Each structure stands twice: as C-alpha cells, then as structure tokens.
Amino acid sequence: MESSRGKPGLNGSGGGAAAFDYSSRRGYYTGAGAALPPLAAGSRAPPVDPCCVALRVFVLLGTLASAVVMAADRQSTTVQIAAGEQLAPPLRVPVTAKWTYSSAFVYFVVANAMVFAFSAAALAAVRRRSAVVPVMVGDLVAMALLFSAVGAAAQFGLLGERGNAHVRWAKVCDVYGPFCERAMAAVVVALIAAFADLVLLMLTILTIHKASSYY
C-alpha cells in the first residue's frame, strides 16, 4: 500500500538522500545519509575573538586602576572656623578626607576589586569550552556590579561637589578639591570599563549564537 512506503531520508530508505542524525541532541545535517558523530565535550577549544580579549584586558586594567586610585585617595587640609567673637582670629582646624569615610566609595572599591579578580580568571579560562557559559554569566554579574558601584560613587561625588540646599548639606569639594578630582576620575574610568563589559557581553552572545547549530 501507499501508506506503507518509507519516506526517503527519514527512515534510511532512499539511498543517497539527505538525512539528519537524530542520535544526538542537535541532529547534525549530513547531506549524504551518513551520520555525523557529535564532537566530544572539550575535544576542541572554542575560537578566541581578539576583540573580546582586548575588551576583557581593558576591563581588567580599568577596574584595577579605579580600585587603586580610589583606595589611595586621601587628603588632609586645614579649614578656618570663625570664632564667636568678631575680634577673635578664626580657628584653624585640621581635617582629613578618606575613601573609607563613605560607604559608597567602599562599595566602589570592593566591586571593582571583584570584577578585576573575575576578569583575570576569565582570561585564564578563555581557551576552555566548558567555561564559555559560566564566564558569560559572570560577565553579566560583573557588569551589574560595575554600573551599581559607579552610580553609588557618582551620586556621593555630586553631593560633595554641589551639596544639597534642601537639607542644608554644604558642598565639601571646594575644601577637598584634589580628593574629589581623584575620586571622580576613578568613577569615570570604571564607567568606561562597565560599558566595555557590556560590549564584551554582547559580542559573546553573538559569537555563541553564530556558532550554535540550532540556527
């Protein structure tokens, strides 16, 4: 009967016809009826994109520079405080600004140090096929850490630069000028590193998408 005939290319009848290998999860196309054995796990290293490596090196160096600059940021100066009596000379009081005095700056240093450590580990595992997905997930977490740390540090820096008239918080960057400049420089470098990590994550996703046999 007509219904009992096998369909060429699906059950092996019809020699020379194009066929698919359904023995593996991906079903590799052979084009000649012969099954193509799937690659063994870890049998071949994934291709390395030089652009991705360059971006990761930039993130590594950028987060290191941001963490070091912020952690070394310290300034001691002297401010004048007017005495109660008009004829009395103003009092000269020594004051010090350090990054540890701000929880936003502490979080900034810790986040950059964590991203630096992850970037170094990711560079060491760049040739391992089994590390592609864990590194991609780590890049997502690192990007979130960087953007949140940059936002917190930038908000505190703007508060020191401009103050807040609504709650009568005076600006302090006119007193601690070099301290604020170094802190904002570290924030800018970390922001650029965060965008570089974003581009790196997008390129990694595109590379995996192109290399996948599903599409």
UniProtKB/Swiss-Prot annotation:
Cytoplasmic side: 1-51, 125-130, 207-215
Keyword Membrane included in the entry's annotation: yes
Compartments reported by the entry: Cell membrane
GO annotation, cellular component aspect: plasma membrane
One Pfam family matching this protein: CASP_dom
Keywords associated with the record: Cell membrane, Membrane, Transmembrane, Transmembrane helix
Domain of life of the source: Eukaryota
InterPro entries to which the protein is assigned, alphabetical: CASP/CASPL, CASP_dom, CASPL
Residues on Extracellular side: 73-103, 152-185
Keyword Aminoacyl-tRNA synthetase carried by entry: no
Mode of membrane association: Multi-pass membrane protein
Residues passing through the membrane, by range: 52-72, 104-124, 131-151, 186-206
Assembly notes: Homodimer and heterodimers.
Family: Belongs to the Casparian strip membrane proteins (CASP) family.
Protein name in the entry: CASP-like protein 1E1
